[in-house]
C-alpha cells in the first residue's frame, strides 16, 4: 500500500462500520484473503458489486469510464502490467494496492466477498511523525 501505508505503520481499524453500511470506492479495508497464508491484508476498494473493472493502456476504467486516482501521487500506476478485466457479481469487491506494480491484490486472487472484509482503516497513529487522522 505504499506510499499511503508502510509495513511498519500502526493503524486503527473500525471493525463495525460495515455492520451499518457497505464499503465504498476508495475505502482502505482490512480483509481475510482466502488464498493467502497471511491472516489479514490491507488494500483499497476499487470496484463495487455490479461494476466492470478494466486495466488497459496504463489506465483504470470502471464501467468504461477512466477512474481518477489522486492518491497514487504520480506513481507509475500500471507500467508493464498486462491488460485485465473483471465483472463483479453481487457482494463482490475489487481491491488494489496503491503500489500497483508490486502489489498482490484482486488481479492475482480475484474479487473478494463482502463477508471477507474485517473493517475500514481510519487513522495511522504510528510512527508519530506520519500520524494522520484520516487515511485517504
Q: At which residue positions do the language-model features occur?
A:
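Soluble "head" domains of membrane/secretory-pathway proteins
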Residues: 2-136
Amino acid at each position: 500500500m505504499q506510499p499511503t501505508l508502510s509495513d511498519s505503520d500502526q493503524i486503527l481499524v473500525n471493525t463495525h462500520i460495515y455492520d451499518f453500511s457497505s464499503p465504498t470506492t476508495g475505502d482502505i479495508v482490512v480483509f481475510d484473503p482466502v488464498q493467502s497464508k497471511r491472516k489479514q491484508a490491507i488494500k483499497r476498494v476499487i470496484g463495487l458489486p455490479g461494476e466492470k473493472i478494466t486495466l488497459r493502456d496504463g489506465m483504470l476504467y470502471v464501467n468504461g469510464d477512466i477512474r481518477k486516482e489522486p492518491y497514487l501521487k504520480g506513481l507509475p500506476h500500471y507500467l508493464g502490467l498486462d491488460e485485465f478485466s473483471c465483472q463483479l457479481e453481487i457482494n463482490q469487491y475489487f481491491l488494489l494496492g496503491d503500489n500497483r506494480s508490486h502489489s498482490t491484490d484482486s488481479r492475482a486472487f480475484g474479487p473478494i466477498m463482502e463477508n471477507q472484509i474485517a473493517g475500514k482503516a481510519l487513522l495511522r497513529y504510528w510512527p508519530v511523525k506520519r500520524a494522520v487522522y484520516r487515511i485517504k
